Amino acid sequence: MSNLCVLFFQFFFLAQFFAEASPLTFELNKGRKECLYTLTPEIDCTISYYFAVQQGESNDFDVNYEIFAPDDKNKPIIERSGERQGEWSFIGQHKGEYAICFYGGKAHDKIVDLDFKYNCERQDDIRNERRKARKAQRNLRDSKTDPLQDSVENSIDTIERQLHVLERNIQYYKSRNTRNHHTVCSTEHRIVMFSIYGILLIIGMSCAQIAILEFIFRESRKHNV
């Protein structure tokens, strides 16, 4: 019974973790700039973002992006060009609205996954709050009086960090797999079109040869007559 409870709590924790970490998917239309925003309630919050271009026509996955701080909406604090995927964290020195803007060029539409969020709590405070929540859910006593429980809590914190790394790796491989699949489909389409053009060219050349031969034989008969 205790093993079933442990498995239940692990499953609940994993489901909650991945539900909170799900990114936003949006369409980046050609020739247009798309901006998304996050509002920080105080200064010195850790702002993090992760994005990956999932689809792009003609193998065009490159986008330009800028990040603007609340104090200056005209001058970006971060600016990158020709990126397919990006991830970074920085300290927001100002309270207010931060914006991340994408531009995919004038040639093709693109599909982008984005995770743009902030965290104003220190990691130690976050771990303590999570531990308190777990204790409240399971009616556990203080871990300071139980070395085994303290060891279990430390193991859970380690699992949380490893899950965060795993989530990022999954997003990276998902993006790479999507781009590779799109590249394969695009290459397959080009091969099919090239084959069709080749067949039509052969048929056209055969018809032209037949017409030329008929014209030559017709002219030779006229001369013989």
From Swiss-Prot:
Signal peptide: 1-23
Bilayer topology term: Single-pass type I membrane protein
Biological process, per Gene Ontology: endoplasmic reticulum to Golgi vesicle-mediated transport; Golgi organization; intracellular protein transport; protein retention in ER lumen; vesicle-mediated transport
Keywords, sorted A to Z: Endoplasmic reticulum, ER-Golgi transport, Membrane, Protein transport, Signal, Transmembrane, Transmembrane helix, Transport
Protein's UniProt name: Protein ERP3
Lumenal compartment residues: 24-195
Pfam families in alphabetical order: EMP24_GP25L
Domain GOLD: 33-172
Regions of compositional bias (Basic residues) in chain numbering: 129-138
Primary location recorded for the protein, binned into one broad class: endoplasmic reticulum
Location relative to the cell: Endoplasmic reticulum membrane
Gene Ontology cellular component annotations, sorted alphabetically: COPII-coated ER to Golgi transport vesicle; endoplasmic reticulum; endoplasmic reticulum membrane; endoplasmic reticulum-Golgi intermediate compartment; Golgi apparatus; membrane
Organism: Saccharomyces cerevisiae (strain ATCC 204508 / S288c)
Note: Present with 3190 molecules/cell in log phase SD medium.
Cross-referenced PROSITE patterns: GOLD
Biological function: Involved in vesicular protein trafficking.
Region listing for Disordered, in residue ranges: 129-149
Transmembrane intervals: 196-216
Ranges facing Cytoplasmic side: 217-225
